[in-house]
Amino acid sequence: MNLHPHLRHSLLASALLLASGLATAAEPQVIAKELQQAKTYTVASAPIEPLQMDPPKLPDLTGFTAEAVQKKIDRRHKGKVSLRRMFQEDTLKEFVGGDNKAAEWVQRQHGIPQAIFVDDGHVDLTELSKKVPKQYFSEVEPGVYLARLPIVVGQKGILEIDGKVKQLRLSQEGGAFLVNDGKLFVTDTQVTGWREKDNGPATFRSPKEFRPFLLSWGGTETYIVNTKMASFGYAKSKSYGVSISQYTPNMAKRMGRPEPTGWIIGSEFSDMWYGFYCYETQDFVIKDSTYRDNIVYGIDPHDRSHRLIIAGNTVYGTKKKHGIIVSREVNDSWIINNKSYDNKLSGVVIDRNSVNNLVAYNEIYRNHTDGITLYESGDNLIWGNKLVNNRRHGIRVRNSVNIRLYENVAMANGLVGVYGHIKDLSDTDRDIALDPFDTKVSLIVVGGELSANGSGPLSIDSPLSVELYKVSMLAPRKASGISLNGVLGERQDEILDLLVRQQKAVLIDPVERQTEMID
């Protein structure tokens, strides 16, 4: 049954299906009670003008270059290098304060823990190597350096690791890691968590096993350009891999440092516990980089980070969870022109009250659950994405209102092209005070194409409202042809008549609102 005059992607859909085999999925076990569904809905044509939007304006990325980073490096004042004990240092309290945390470093250093500090000006790594005893920091072969102690960049320090360094190895046995409390520039090099016993990378073995990491605190700037980082991070706070984080709330009040920032450009991250993590970070840019075969997440901005740009990256092979996820009030950010594929769960996730974000022009395919997932995050614009051959839904929207889906192509996904639903999460282990939610969902779907999805193009349960306009539905996988699920299925003939035959916008509205049903 051909419902639309142009078949611009149907041949591609057929080819994908033949080449890859149909995506398959099993329904997950329901772990929380579902709300009562609305009984009756009205279907009517809606005015078109409010639905018409110009393509979203994208941020200008031309200034985020390797050359621009070089101009930021102030080499005028030579810095100081010293060895100091790790205790009494604000930058290291997270790792040695309370709960017998210092035992990790006592054991690894066989004595009172100490670190290498860079203060009061610019130091490059080759200079640093000349100022630290060889048992702590040495050149093991030309251009290859091994650090056996943590390296800390002080508040007025600038550390530069550049192309003169072929590789910086951070010793797992020695307990080495990098903490930036000033400015850190890593360009044209490699930084690797290193297992001396194996004379090779500190590849992941266990979540609790220490591996080297990089952490930049509040008030800092971090620039990583044309660099490979590998085998970082484990399941300890702020030790996840590459982390950019404001100080903990009590320390942040005392120290009064602004939110950290920085750029990552043209770099590669692999075998990291988290490829990237940030907390209360602003204006950070991750551009044209590769995140591959990381353990839990590829890119994971968190808590109250804002105005982030995640653009032109390739994220794949994440082993436990999602490729790209922003979670807990990560607002006003751009996730654009990325590829996210072959990840264990979803390709891109917007989670926990993250609002006013743009997810646009991404290619998201072969993920083991959804292409794009929105959980409890309203007021987001999803524009011009291609969601192909994901095992579950192309786009899934849960407990989120005013979600605008424009010009997306969801094709050959295992279940539904676009799936909207509500869920009561109060019976789960969620902290409702920290992460509140409303059991409401509303969608506007304009343009694009929903083709050859296993369970149909669209399914929406108990929406506050749904508007559909110019949505092309082609190549149904069911012998019965196009079938809409959820509340749309009950009024399918009317909806398709308005949407397809009359080319009108369709508004589906419940007669009784969710609040009335809850009462």
UniProtKB/Swiss-Prot annotation:
SUPFAM superfamilies xrefs: Pectin lyase-like
Reactions the enzyme catalyzes: [(1->4)-beta-D-mannuronosyl](n) = [alginate](n)
Residues making up the signal peptide according to the UniProt record: 1-25
InterPro entries documented for this protein: Beta_helix (IPR039448), Carb-bd_sugar_hydrolysis-dom (IPR006633), Mannuronan_C5-epimerase (IPR053409), Para_beta_helix_rpt-2 (IPR022441), PbH1 (IPR006626), Pectin_lyas_fold (IPR012334), Pectin_lyase_fold/virulence (IPR011050)
Single Gene Ontology MF annotation: isomerase activity
UniProt keyword annotation of Repeat present: yes
Active site: H302 (proton acceptor)
Pathway the protein takes part in: Glycan biosynthesis; alginate biosynthesis
GO biological process: alginic acid biosynthetic process
EC number: 5.1.3.37
Nucleotide-binding in keyword set: no
Compartments, record wording: Periplasm
Keywords of the record: Alginate biosynthesis, Isomerase, Periplasm, Repeat, Signal
Domain of life: Bacteria
The PbH1 repeat ranges on this chain: 219-246, 281-303, 305-328, 330-352, 354-376, 377-399
A Gene Ontology term for the protein's cellular component: periplasmic space
Cited function: Catalyzes the epimerization of beta-D-mannuronate to alpha-L-guluronate during the synthesis of the linear polysaccharide alginate. In addition, is part of a periplasmic protein complex that protects alginate from degradation by AlgL by channeling the newly formed alginate polymer through a scaffold that transfers the alginate polymer through the periplasmic space to the outer membrane secretin AlgE.
NCBIfam families: epimerase_AlgG (NF038177), para_beta_helix (TIGR03804)
Protein family membership: Belongs to the D-mannuronate C5-epimerase family.
Protein name: Mannuronan C5-epimerase
